[in-house]
Amino acid sequence: MFDVLMYLFETYIHTEAELRVDQDKLEQDLTDAGFDREDIYNALLWLEKLADYQEGLAEPMQLASDPLSMRIYTPEECERLDASCRGFLLFLEQIQVLNLETREMVIERVLALDTAEFDLEDLKWVILMVLFNIPGCENAHQQMEELLFEVNEGMLH
């Protein structure tokens, strides 16, 4: 499913291709690209839930906004988000790429993925997808994009 999301993000969303694609055509394109129907369905459902945030149909968990409070992760969250992922989320909060609400949206979308393996690079892409879909997060999205591509470009040298 995550591969389908990555393909969609890179092919349709991130490249600013026509976003209003017929769902049947999209499903056919994904099938032609070699993706499994169940993965396609799950990825589209995942994106629908993400779009609910954008449209105001879903709200992230309401949290105390005390700056001295600290997020305690559940065992399920710790299982999916290792220490490096949790540290990266904290880092993004500290540099104000994420706020309390967007952090919770990211965690919720990560837990909704049906993938056995999940690492820091995957988390970065989920964060990018969430920020791209939330109105008012354009600057945060741009910062996250710079962080993601700057680090990856440095690895190529």
From Swiss-Prot:
Instruction: Report the domain of life of the source organism.
Output: Bacteria
Q: Which Pfam family would be a valid example here?
A: DUF494
InterPro entries recorded? Smg
Q: Which PANTHER family has this protein been placed in?
A: PROTEIN SMG
Q: Which family does it belong to?
A: Belongs to the Smg family.
Q: Which NCBIfam families match?
A: PRK03430.1
By what name is this protein known?
A: Protein Smg
